[in-house]
Protein backbone atom coordinates (compact mmCIF):
# COMPACT_ATOMS: atom_id res chain seq x y z
CA UNK A 1 0.00 0.00 0.00
CA UNK A 2 1.10 3.56 -0.71
CA UNK A 3 0.42 6.54 1.55
CA UNK A 4 -0.24 10.05 0.27
CA UNK A 5 -0.58 13.34 2.13
CA UNK A 6 -2.96 16.02 0.91
CA UNK A 7 -1.44 19.50 1.29
CA UNK A 8 -3.16 22.87 1.46
CA UNK A 9 -1.87 26.03 -0.26
CA UNK A 10 0.70 26.47 2.56
CA UNK A 11 1.96 22.87 2.28
CA UNK A 12 0.30 21.88 5.55
CA UNK A 13 -0.92 18.26 5.66
CA UNK A 14 -4.72 18.03 5.74
CA UNK A 15 -5.03 14.25 5.68
CA UNK A 16 -3.14 11.07 4.80
CA UNK A 17 -4.74 8.36 2.66
CA UNK A 18 -3.79 4.84 1.65
CA UNK A 19 -4.00 3.73 -1.99
CA UNK A 20 -3.15 0.51 -3.77
CA UNK A 21 0.34 -0.24 -5.04
CA UNK A 22 -1.22 -1.38 -8.33
CA UNK A 23 -1.99 2.16 -9.54
CA UNK A 24 -0.34 2.61 -12.92
CA UNK A 25 2.45 5.11 -13.46
CA UNK A 26 4.41 5.81 -16.62
CA UNK A 27 7.22 3.72 -15.10
CA UNK A 28 5.06 0.77 -13.99
CA UNK A 29 3.05 0.05 -10.84
CA UNK A 30 3.15 2.65 -8.06
CA UNK A 31 4.40 0.00 -5.62
CA UNK A 32 7.63 -0.18 -7.62
CA UNK A 33 7.97 3.59 -8.15
CA UNK A 34 7.97 5.54 -4.90
CA UNK A 35 7.30 9.29 -5.12
CA UNK A 36 6.18 9.09 -8.76
CA UNK A 37 4.24 12.17 -9.90
CA UNK A 38 1.60 9.91 -11.48
CA UNK A 39 0.60 8.75 -7.98
CA UNK A 40 0.11 12.37 -6.94
CA UNK A 41 -1.97 13.06 -10.05
CA UNK A 42 -4.07 9.95 -9.45
CA UNK A 43 -4.87 11.09 -5.88
CA UNK A 44 -5.82 14.56 -7.07
CA UNK A 45 -8.26 13.15 -9.62
CA UNK A 46 -9.64 10.32 -7.50
CA UNK A 47 -10.27 12.49 -4.43
CA UNK A 48 -11.41 15.44 -6.59
CA UNK A 49 -8.95 17.88 -5.01
CA UNK A 50 -7.39 19.50 -8.06
CA UNK A 51 -6.62 22.69 -6.07
CA UNK A 52 -4.54 20.86 -3.44
CA UNK A 53 -1.21 19.09 -3.83
CA UNK A 54 -0.50 15.46 -2.96
CA UNK A 55 2.87 14.01 -1.87
CA UNK A 56 3.68 10.41 -1.12
CA UNK A 57 4.84 9.71 2.42
CA UNK A 58 6.69 6.66 3.69
CA UNK A 59 5.18 4.65 6.53
CA UNK A 60 8.69 3.27 7.20
CA UNK A 61 10.38 6.70 6.91
CA UNK A 62 12.31 5.53 3.84
CA UNK A 63 11.92 8.91 2.13
CA UNK A 64 10.87 12.47 2.91
CA UNK A 65 12.32 12.21 6.43
CA UNK A 66 9.25 10.94 8.26
CA UNK A 67 5.71 9.76 7.87
CA UNK A 68 3.41 12.74 7.37
CA UNK A 69 0.65 13.48 9.84
CA UNK A 70 -2.12 16.04 9.99
CA UNK A 71 -0.57 19.43 10.71
CA UNK A 72 2.88 18.51 9.41
CA UNK A 73 4.51 20.81 6.84
CA UNK A 74 5.95 19.66 3.53
CA UNK A 75 9.18 21.54 2.79
CA UNK A 76 9.42 21.47 -1.01
CA UNK A 77 13.01 22.77 -1.08
CA UNK A 78 14.17 19.94 1.20
CA UNK A 79 11.63 17.38 -0.09
CA UNK A 80 10.65 16.31 3.42
CA UNK A 81 7.87 16.45 5.97
CA UNK A 82 8.50 18.41 9.17
CA UNK A 83 6.47 17.82 12.31
CA UNK A 84 4.54 20.70 13.91
CA UNK A 85 6.50 22.97 16.24
CA UNK A 86 5.85 21.62 19.76
CA UNK A 87 6.54 24.89 21.61
CA UNK A 88 7.25 28.50 20.62
CA UNK A 89 10.76 28.44 22.11
CA UNK A 90 11.91 25.37 20.15
CA UNK A 91 13.95 25.58 16.94
CA UNK A 92 14.79 23.21 14.10
CA UNK A 93 18.26 21.68 14.13
CA UNK A 94 20.34 20.74 11.07
CA UNK A 95 18.32 17.51 10.70
CA UNK A 96 15.00 19.39 10.84
CA UNK A 97 14.15 17.98 14.25
CA UNK A 98 12.68 20.32 16.87
CA UNK A 99 15.00 21.03 19.79
CA UNK A 100 14.27 22.75 23.08
CA UNK A 101 16.49 25.69 24.05
CA UNK A 102 17.73 23.52 26.94
CA UNK A 103 19.16 20.10 26.08
CA UNK A 104 17.02 17.14 27.15
CA UNK A 105 18.07 15.85 30.59
CA UNK A 106 20.81 13.24 30.68
CA UNK A 107 19.42 11.70 33.87
CA UNK A 108 16.11 9.99 33.18
CA UNK A 109 15.79 7.75 36.24
CA UNK A 110 17.06 7.39 39.77
CA UNK A 111 17.23 4.20 41.79
CA UNK A 112 15.42 2.35 39.01
CA UNK A 113 12.52 4.82 39.09
CA UNK A 114 11.95 6.61 35.79
CA UNK A 115 11.16 10.29 35.76
CA UNK A 116 8.11 11.47 33.84
CA UNK A 117 9.82 14.32 31.99
CA UNK A 118 8.07 17.20 30.23
CA UNK A 119 8.90 20.64 28.88
CA UNK A 120 7.63 23.68 30.79
CA UNK A 121 7.24 26.42 28.17
CA UNK A 122 6.29 29.12 30.68
CA UNK A 123 9.57 28.72 32.59
CA UNK A 124 11.68 27.41 29.68
CA UNK A 125 12.93 24.34 31.52
CA UNK A 126 12.51 20.62 31.86
CA UNK A 127 10.36 19.39 34.72
CA UNK A 128 9.67 15.91 36.01
CA UNK A 129 7.66 13.87 38.45
CA UNK A 130 8.31 10.45 39.88
CA UNK A 131 5.78 7.77 40.72
CA UNK A 132 6.20 7.87 44.49
CA UNK A 133 3.31 8.47 46.85
CA UNK A 134 3.07 11.38 47.29
CA UNK A 135 4.47 12.41 43.90
CA UNK A 136 7.70 14.42 43.91
CA UNK A 137 8.22 17.31 41.48
CA UNK A 138 11.60 18.25 40.03
CA UNK A 139 13.26 20.94 37.91
CA UNK A 140 16.26 20.11 35.75
CA UNK A 141 19.48 22.01 36.49
CA UNK A 142 21.14 22.08 33.06
CA UNK A 143 24.42 23.38 34.51
CA UNK A 144 24.86 20.83 37.30
CA UNK A 145 23.08 18.10 35.27
CA UNK A 146 20.90 17.13 38.22
CA UNK A 147 17.25 17.16 39.20
CA UNK A 148 16.27 19.50 42.03
CA UNK A 149 13.30 18.51 44.17
CA UNK A 150 10.80 21.38 44.40
Spans of model-derived segments:
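Viral virion structural and adsorption modules
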Residues: 1-150
Amino acid sequence: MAHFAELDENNIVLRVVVVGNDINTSAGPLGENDMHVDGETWCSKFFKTETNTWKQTSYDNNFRKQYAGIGYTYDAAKNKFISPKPHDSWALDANDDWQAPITYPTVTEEGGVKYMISWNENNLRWTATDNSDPVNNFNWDATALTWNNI
